[in-house]
């Protein structure tokens, strides 16, 4: 009799367990469905915006802070970030409509305008105020002068691109003729110059990060000068969109700019280490210490503005650089290619 009762109790316990487990599974699935539905509804309430960036670089830290901290979502934007690998490709994406907003050197907007584009691209937010590249030598040169480049070979950048034009601008400012006083090799792709230099090609190379830092860590090169410091304040990279897009989507552009400003504010108020930790998910192939080293280098040279306002004097300096490089026959009007409305509102 006792054995029979025990069996009945065991069967009852198993039934209750199965019933509870089934109920719990249903509740878990129901809770999961609610979470997924909430996430879907949230995404559906956001405005999709495709941003094409010229390159994916720690140089643009405030933008990545805005992404990682969720500032774009706070402003109602579901951001799709695409890397164009070159200002020409980024501009093509914006003009063709495959990207809503472009992030590139502002010289691209001047070129497009002067070529007669009807729905031309307008700059609405300036992120960086200094060049982000560095001159790397094969040996340490504690007391470097730009005249040390005379009769040397340097790995440069693409003709007509901002890295090369800023480099040549500095040379001219120091009495050096880029076409006569040294050899500038422009045959190597942007992303391959550091490797070429490490293999023994040239006496100097002009490098962005992490190329410059990696060469130093490998003891294959040494940073001897900052093009950002020696060229002065230059509107190196800015956000832009077609005139028609800005007119039709003013609220989106304002929200986008507001999100960027939050990123700018974060960078101004936090240490390089904190900034590095914030943007680390964007650079999974780079260790945190290297990211911090690079952020510190940019931080110390005052790379990032405290606002996004693209001032006229900066635009005119940019055109001076284009003219000195022989890339500009006709100056473009600031009032046509730049609007400060959104950045000014974001800064308040």
Give each language-model segment a name:
Residues 19-31:
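Bacterial lipoprotein signal-peptidase II cleavage site
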Residues 57, 84-88, 103, 157-162, ...:
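Soluble non-cytosolic domains of exported or imported proteins
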Residues 318-348:
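Conserved C-terminal helix/tail region of periplasmic/extracytoplasmic solute-binding proteins
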Residues 9-18:
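Bacterial N-terminal signal peptides
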Residues 247-329:
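Secondary-structure end/capping motifs
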Residues 29-177, 184-187, 196, 203-209, ...:
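Short, glycine-/small- and polar/acidic-enriched structural segments
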Residues 139, 189-283:
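Pocket-lining segment of extracytoplasmic ligand-binding domains
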Residues 1-9:
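Bacterial N-terminal signal peptides that target proteins for export
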